[in-house]
Amino acid sequence: MVIQGKRLAASSIQLLASSLDAKKLCYEYDERQAPGVTQITEEAPTEQPPLSTPPSLPQTPNISPISASKIVIDDVALSRVQIVQALVARKLKTAIAQLPTSKSIKELSGGRSSLQNELVGDIHNEFSSIPDAPEQILLRDFGDANPTVQLGKTSSAAVAKLISSKMPSDFNANAIRAHLANKWGLGPLRQTAVLLYAIASEPPSRLASSSAAEEYWDNVSSMYAESCGITLRPRQDTMNEDAMASSAIDPAVVAEFSKGHRRLGVQQFQALAEYLQIDLSGSQASQSDALVAELQQKVDLWTAEMTPEFLAGISPMLDVKKSRRYGSWWNMARQDVLAFYRRPSYSEFVDDALAFKVFLNRLCNRADEALLNMVRSLSCDAYFKQGSLPGYHAASRLLEQAITSTVADCPKARLILPAVGPHTTITKDGTIEYAEAPRQGVSGPTAYIQSLRQGASFIGLKSADVDTQSNLTDALLDAMCLALHNGISFVGKTFLVTGAGQGSIGAGVVRLLLEGGARVLVTTSREPATTSRYFQQMYDNHGAKFSELRVVPCNLASAQDCEGLIRHVYDPRGLNWDLDAILPFAAASDYSTEMHDIRGQSELGHRLMLVNVFRVLGHIVHCKRDAGVDCHPTQVLLPLSPNHGIFGGDGMYPESKLALESLFHRIRSESWSDQLSICGVRIGWTRSTGLMTAHDIIAETVEEHGIRTFSVAEMALNIAMLLTPDFVAHCEDGPLDADFTGSLGTLGSIPGFLAQLHQKVQLAAEVIRAVQAEDEHERFLSPGTKPTLQAPVAPMHPRSSLRVGYPRLPDYEQEIRPLSPRLERLQDPANAVVVVGYSELGPWGSARLRWEIESQGQWTSAGYVELAWLMNLIRHVNDESYVGWVDTQTGKPVRDGEIQALYGDHIDNHTGIRPIQSTSYNPERMEVLQEVAVEEDLPEFEVSQLTADAMRLRHGANVSIRPSGNPDACHVKLKRGAVILVPKTVPFVWGSCAGELPKGWTPAKYGIPENLIHQVDPVTLYTICCVAEAFYSAGITHPLEVFRHIHLSELGNFIGSSMGGPTKTRQLYRDVYFDHEIPSDVLQDTYLNTPAAWVNMLLLGCTGPIKTPVGACATGVESIDSGYESIMAGKTKMCLVGGYDDLQEEASYGFAQLKATVNVEEEIACGRQPSEMSRPMAESRAGFVEAHGCGVQLLCRGDIALQMGLPIYAVIASSAMAADKIGSSVPAPGQGILSFSRERARSSMISVTSRPSSRSSTSSEVSDKSSLTSITSISNPAPRAQRARSTTDMAPLRAALATWGLTIDDLDVASLHGTSTRGNDLNEPEVIETQMRHLGRTPGRPLWAICQKSVTGHPKAPAAAWMLNGCLQVLDSGLVPGNRNLDTLDEALRSASHLCFPTRTVQLREVKAFLLTSFGFGQKGGQVVGVAPKYFFATLPRPEVEGYYRKVRVRTEAGDRAYAAAVMSQAVVKIQTQNPYDEPDAPRIFLDPLARISQDPSTGQYRFRSDATPALDDDALPPPGEPTELVKGISSAWIEEKVRPHMSPGGTVGVDLVPLASFDAYKNAIFVERNYTVRERDWAEKSADVRAAYASRWCAKEAVFKCLQTHSQGAGAAMKEIEIEHGGNGAPKVKLRGAAQTAARQRGLEGVQLSISYGDDAVIAVALGLMSGAS
C-alpha cells in the first residue's frame, strides 16, 4: 500500500483476479476458528436440513482469536417432537414453551374438527410416514420413531414465509444464520431449531430495520435456550479483551490514510459539482444568511417592542366557516307547549308565579297561528286527562289567553324586573353570604324605575354636543316605565355585539334583543365548540319569532379580523346585513398593572378597546359608502366608564375608555356622520359580572354611601332602551351621553375605600367566629357539664351498586285499575309479543351507560364504575386482605367515589364519537397499492424456489432467476418492463372519526376464553356478550333456564347484520391476495349467520330457527319484524332479535364515495368537535358518523312471560317492512313504509273507551269487513291487528294501537332513523307527517321526535336495536332525550307539524306508545309500534297481575345479585361445553314437544332427565274447536259496531254466537220444553242437522233478548215467549208474546228483524230492533 508516494513497510502488494478472488475483493472471509480448541458436538448427520443449511458462512476478518475460555455449545439436531410442537403451536398461536407435550392434538384443539384436520394434514406433509390416528397421539410420542430429522415441507415453507413476509429486505436466511452464529455461537443445527421456534412467535408485521430483526431473533434465541436448558452468552463478551489487545496498527498511519481518502473524495465532489453547475463558492448562501439575519433582526425588534404575548394576542382567528346559527324559534315553541301539557306536575307554576310569567312571556313572543291551534288542541285533550293535577286548570287557561291575545303581535322583550338590591349577611358560624333582596319602598312592575327616581343622579341622558344642552333623563325614565309595561320590539333590526360572554352585560343585552325579535351577530374569542352550548341555551330560552342569533369566532385585537368581520356582515355573499347598531363591548382585563408595570398585555388591551374599535367603525363607514348607504346611520353604543383612573392598577383601561369620548367631537369634525351615530354609555357598578363579582359582598355597604349598584338585567335594560326608535332618532340628531354610573364617580380614592369595606366585612365575620369559639369553650368548662369525648368517625365512602336496570312495575290502583274496565280480557296474553330483555354494546358501552349520556349528558357514579370495569381500568378482588375494586395496572385499591377523579378524563376521551383509536384501522394511513412498471432492472433478491416459480409464471420474460447457494432458494431479478404493485399510504381523513367501543373493552372481561377470542370475528364476540347481557336483563341468570318452560325448538335467533364480520372477510380476500397466512377456518366466520350459530353453540344449544336478516341500515328493524311474525305465527315462543356490525375500512371508504358519511376534515375546519359531527335534522348536517357494536332484544310470547315472571319492558303491538318505487338509486330514501298506514277511509268504529264494560262489548277498533262470511274466521285466535292487515278500511298501524285500546293520538314518541344525511332527514319526517295526517291524528298534538344517532352515530345493522332499547327506557322513565347537537332545525321541517324535535331532555308524566322507524339502503323501510306494559297488565285479572308481580320481584332481585357477581368474577358469559342431555337422548328430546329441562338442586346445572319427561296438564288445554269467551265477545262486538251506524236513531241491536260443538242442551227434554214452541220443535226435528237447528233458534232468541234491552230474570229464565218462525222466503221472523212483547212496546220498538248465519263450527245471530216509523 502506498500513501503519498511511500510504501508502508508492513504491507505487501497482492494481485487479485475477479474470477478467482471474488471473496477477497468483496471482503468476505471464512469463519475463524480458535487455535487449540476443538468443538465438541454430539453425533449429527453430515448433511444439514435443506432450507436451514446456507452456503458456507462468510469468512470473518481474522482480527483476533476467540478466547480459549469461551464456552462451546453443542450443535444438536432437531427432534420430531420439536417440529410437531412448533407446527401445533403455530396453528394455536401459542408459545412452544406453553404447549404441553402430554396432550394430543385433539385435546389441544378443543374439539375443533377443522383445526385437527388441518394439523394432521400439515404433519402428513412434514414427515414421510406417521402413525395412524395422529390426532390422538400425545405430542411426546411423535419422537419415538426417528430421533433426529431435517425440516420437512411444511416447516420449511413456514420458515421461508416468515423470512419473506416479516423480515427486512436485507435480513434474509443467510443474515439470520450469520447473526445467530456470530452473536450466540450457535451451530447450523441449532440455528435451524431457532428458525423453527420463530414460526410459533411471528412478529405481527414486517420489522422495520435490521436492528429490530436482530432484537427479534435474540428474543427467539432466548426462548429456545430456555426450553432446551442451555445458557447463551453473547460472543462479544468473550472477545472484548482479546480484541483490544490485538490492535497493532499505528494511529498516525491510520490518520494519514484517512486524510488521503478524504482528499480524493473532495476532489471527486468538486468535479461533480462543476459538471452539474452547482455553485460551491457560497455566494448564494451568504445572501440567504444576510436575508435571514435581516429578518431575524426585525423579529427580534418586534418581540422586544411588542412582547411575545402581544404578538400572540393579535393573531387572527376569524373563520366564517366556524360560525354557528340559531333560528328555529318555532320548534322551541312547540317544545315548550308540548312539554307544558305533558309535564307530570304543575306545582312549579303554582309555587313560583314569577317563573310562570317568564314562561308565558317566552311563549307569547313565539306565538303564531300554528302555536295557538296547538295550545287549543292540547288544552281540550288535557282537560279530561290532567284535570286532577293541582294548578293545571289555572295555568292552562292563562296560557291559552296569553297566546290568543298576542298571536298577531310582534315579539317584545317583556322584562320582569323586580327591584332588588345587594344584601350581605354573616351566618352564626361566620360564613359570609351574598344574595339579592327586594328594595324597600318600591313595588309593582315599575319598581326599578321608582328606585332610580329616588336618586337625583343615578342615571342620566343628555346630548354630548357642547352646543346642545338637552336633558333627556326624564324621557328615558318614562320610556323605561312604558317598556316594563308593554315590552320592547326589535323586529327587523340587526345588531353586532362584541363581548357577550357568560355573565356579561353584553350577554344581557343580547337576550333582550333576541326576545324583541332582532337578528344578532355575536363575536367570541373562543372556539365555537366551547361556547356553542351556552349560546344555544341562550337562544332556546330567549329567541322570539323572527329572531336569529349568529356566533362567529373573531379576535378583535387583530386588524385583519376587524376588517374581515365587517366585510362578512356587508358582503352580499356573506350575511348581506346593514347594521342598525353595534355594541363594541369586548374588553380585556389587566389587573394589578400600574404605570411603571405597563407591558404587552396592557398594550393589547388598549388596542382591543380603543384602536380596533376605531378600525371596526372605519370599516363600517367604508362598506356603507361602497353600498351607497348614507341615510341609515349605524348607531354606535360606546362602552364608556367613570373609571378615569380612580380605581388604579388597571393598565390602559381608563385611557382606552377616556379616549373613546373623542368620537363625540369627531362626528362633527370628520366626514362619517351619514354612516354612524354615536351614543356613549357610561357603565357603573354592575354586580356579579366578571370584573365586580369579588366586590358583591360589599355592594350593600357601597350603596349606603349614596352609590347605586345595578344587576346585569338592570344595566342591560338601560342600554337596550338606547336602541329603541325614539333614542335612535335623538342619536342621529347628535351624539348622546348616557350616564348609568349610579354616581360612582363621586367617590374619591376607590382602591382604599374598597379595601376598607372588605376589611370591615371580614373583621365582622372573624369576630362572630371568635365569639362562637369562645361560647363553645365556656360551655365545655361550665359546672355540671361532662365533657364528651367522641371517638373519631371513619369517613363514609359511598358504594355504587351494579344493577341491570329492570323496569318499574306500574302501580295497580293508580295506573292499571283505571284501564281494566275497558281492557280486561280484551286480549289473550298468548296473542301478545312482549320485550322481556335487551342489551347493547356501543360507543358508550352498555345500554344503561348510553341512556345516562343520552338523557342526562353525564354519568352517575354507578355509570363510572361500570365504565371503568368495562374499559379494563379496574377489576374486582375478593381475598383475605381486601374486597373491592383495584386498579388493573397497579393493583392499588380504588374506592367507588374515586373512580371519576382517577379515570374521568380517560373515560371522557375514549368513549363516544371520537377520532378512531383502533389499532387495526388507522384512517390517517390507509394502505393502497399503486401499479408501477419497472423502468430499470432491479437488484437481485433471494426467495424460495416456490416463490421464484410463481414469479416466473406471473412476469414471464421480465424476471430473471438463478440458483443460489441454498438449494431451496433462488436469486430473482425483476427486469425492465415488469409490472409490480407498490404499497403506499394515503390519508383517509374523511372517515377518521367514529363511534368506537370504549377503549380497553375486551371480551375477556365477560368470561370468554382467549382461544375463542382469537378464533372468531370480533362481531361474534360483540353478539355473544350482548346475548348474555340480554338474558340477565330478562332476569334469566342462565340461558338454559328458558327450556324449563318451552321446547328446544321454540327459541329462535333472528340477529342479523348488514356486512358480517369484516376482520375475517378481510383475511379471506385481502390477506390471501397478499399471500399472508390465514386460518384454515376463516371462511366459516365470513358468513353472516355464523355469529348466531356461535351464540347457539356456546350459550343455548336450541333447535329453533336461525334466520339472518340482511337489511343494510334497517337490519335491526327487519330482525324485530321477523321475530314478531315468528311468535305470532306460532313457530316460536321466544326470539332473540337485533343486529351487529363492525367498523370496516373498505366500507367506510365506500360510504365516503357515496358522500353519505361526514367529511371529518371539513367538519374540523368548521370548528366541530367529533361529538358534534352527527347532527340529525340540523340545518348544518353533513352526513352520518359511523359506529359499530351490537344490539339485542329478547322477545317473548305474553303468556310465557307471565308464567316465567319475566320483566316486561314493552308490548310489540305490530311491525312492518316495505320496499319502494321503481328507480335506479339503491341508497335513495323511499316512502314505501307509508303502506303501514294504508286504509281507504278513516275508520268510523266506536273507540273502546266509549263502550260498555261488559265482556260482550269490550273490544277495540277491529277489522272493518263489510259482511260476515265465516264464523271460523271470527273465532280465529290470531290477534285482530294481524287480521286487519288484509282489510281496506283500517290501517295496520291503527289496528295495532286499537288492539290495546289506544288511538293514533295516543302515540307519544317517534324514534327516528335520523342519520344526519340530507336526504333521509327530510324524507323520514315527511313519511311520518303523511301517516299522521292520513290516520287523522288530531292537529296540534305532535309526537316527540327522538334522534338517538346524535349521541351514538350510525352503527348500520344495530341501529334499530339501539333505538328500540332507547324507546324501552323512555317508556320506563318518562324521559324524552333531546338532540343536543341540534343548533338550528332545518327550515324544511317546519311543515312537519306532527313532530316536535326537543333539544333538551323533557320529563313526561307517562308515555303510552311509541313508533320506531328505520330505513336501509336497498329499499328497506320498517316501522315498529310499541305499547307501555301497563296496557298488557290491564287485560289481566287483578289476582293474575299481583301473582305476576310477586314472581318478577323474586326474579329481578336474583338477577341483580347474579349480574353483580358475574361482573365481579368476570363470568357474564357462561360458555357451554356440552349439551344438557346425553347424546342418545337427543332424538327423543327433539321429537318430544313436551320435553323440558330441569335443574339439579345440588349442582345448579340444567339437564334433560333421561328417565322422564314432564307432561303437560290436560286441563290447561281448551276443548278442540271451542271458541273462547274472549273470541265470542270480540265477534259480537264487531258485528254490533258494523250494524249500528246503519240503524235508525233509537234502534237497538243484539248479537249472539253459539258454538256447535259445545251445544248439547237440545238433548235435554226439559230444556227444549221450556224454551222452544211446538212449531220450533217440529221444524228442528225435521231438519237434517238437529243440533244446528236447535242451536240456531237458541242463538236467535238470545240475540232478540239482547235487542229488547230489558232487565234479565237470570240465565234460567224461559225463552218460549220469543218464537222464531220460518218465513216463506227462508228468512227467519220474530214473534213476541207476553213479557217479551211488553218489553218491546215499552222500548218503542215496532218490530225486530233477524239474521242468522251458519258456519262449520258456530252459529251467529243478529237482531235489529226497529223504532216506530223507521224502515
UniProtKB/Swiss-Prot annotation:
Q: Which of the residues bear the PTM O-(pantetheine 4'-phosphoryl)serine? A: 113
Q: Please provide, alphabetically and separated by semicolons, the GO molecular function terms listed in this UniProt record.
A: 3-oxoacyl-[acyl-carrier-protein] reductase (NADPH) activity; 3-oxoacyl-[acyl-carrier-protein] synthase activity; fatty acid synthase activity; fatty-acyl-CoA synthase activity; holo-[acyl-carrier-protein] synthase activity; magnesium ion binding
Binding residues for Mg(2+), per the UniProt record? 1552, 1653
* EC annotation from Swiss-Prot or TrEMBL: 2.3.1.86, 1.1.1.100, 2.3.1.41
Question: Which residue ranges are recorded for the region named Disordered?
Answer: 40-60, 1244-1288, 1497-1521
Q: Looking at the keywords, is Oxidoreductase present? A: yes
Q: Which UniProt keywords apply?
A: Fatty acid biosynthesis, Fatty acid metabolism, Lipid biosynthesis, Lipid metabolism, Magnesium, Metal-binding, Multifunctional enzyme, NADP, Oxidoreductase, Phosphopantetheine, Phosphoprotein, Transferase
Task: State the post-translational modifications.
Answer: 4'-phosphopantetheine is transferred from CoA to a specific serine of the acyl carrier domain by the C-terminal PPT domain. This modification is essential for activity because fatty acids are bound in thioester linkage to the sulfhydryl of the prosthetic group.
Q: Where is the secretion signal located?
A: none
Q: Give Gene Ontology CC terms.
A: fatty acid synthase complex; transferase complex
- Where is composition skewed (Pro residues) in this entry? 47-58
Location of region: Ketoreductase (KR) domain: 492-729
Tell me the ranges covered by the Carrier domain, including all copies. 75-153
Please name the InterPro entries in this protein's record. 4-PPantetheinyl_Trfase_dom, 4-PPantetheinyl_Trfase_dom_sf, Fas_alpha_ACP, FAS_alpha_su_C, FAS_alpha_yeast, FASI_helical, Fungal_FAS, Ketoacyl_synth_AS
Give one GO biological process term: aflatoxin biosynthetic process
Active site location: 1113 (for beta-ketoacyl synthase activity), 1313 (for beta-ketoacyl synthase activity), 1354 (for beta-ketoacyl synthase activity)
Pfam families (alphabetical): ACPS, Fas_alpha_ACP, FAS_I_H, ketoacyl-synt, Ketoacyl-synt_C, KR
For the Ketosynthase family 3 (KS3) domain, which residue ranges apply?
926-1428
**Residues bound to acetyl-CoA:** 1552-1554, 1598-1608, 1622-1625, 1652-1654
- What pathway is this protein said to act in by its record? Mycotoxin biosynthesis; aflatoxin biosynthesis
Name the residue ranges with Low complexity bias. 1244-1270
Which reactions are catalysed by this chain?
A: acetyl-CoA + n malonyl-CoA + 2n NADPH + 4n H(+) = a long-chain-acyl-CoA + n CoA + n CO2 + 2n NADP(+); a fatty acyl-[ACP] + malonyl-[ACP] + H(+) = a 3-oxoacyl-[ACP] + holo-[ACP] + CO2; a (3R)-hydroxyacyl-[ACP] + NADP(+) = a 3-oxoacyl-[ACP] + NADPH + H(+)
- Quaternary form? [Alpha(6)beta(6)] hexamers of two multifunctional subunits (alpha and beta).
Entry similarity comment: Belongs to the thiolase-like superfamily. Fungal fatty acid synthetase subunit alpha family.
Q: What is the documented function of this protein?
A: Fatty acid synthase alpha subunit; part of the gene cluster that mediates the biosynthesis of aflatoxins, a group of polyketide-derived furanocoumarins, and part of the most toxic and carcinogenic compounds among the known mycotoxins. The four major aflatoxins produced by A.parasiticus are aflatoxin B1 (AFB1), aflatoxin B2 (AFB2), aflatoxin G1 (AFG1) and aflatoxin G2 (AFG2). Within the aflatoxin pathway, the fungal fatty acid synthase aflA/aflB provides the hexanoyl starter unit to the acyl-carrier protein (ACP) domain of the norsolorinic acid synthase to allow the first step of the pathway.
Protein name as catalogued? Fatty acid synthase alpha subunit aflA
Task: Give the organism, scientific name.
Answer: Aspergillus parasiticus (strain ATCC 56775 / NRRL 5862 / SRRC 143 / SU-1)
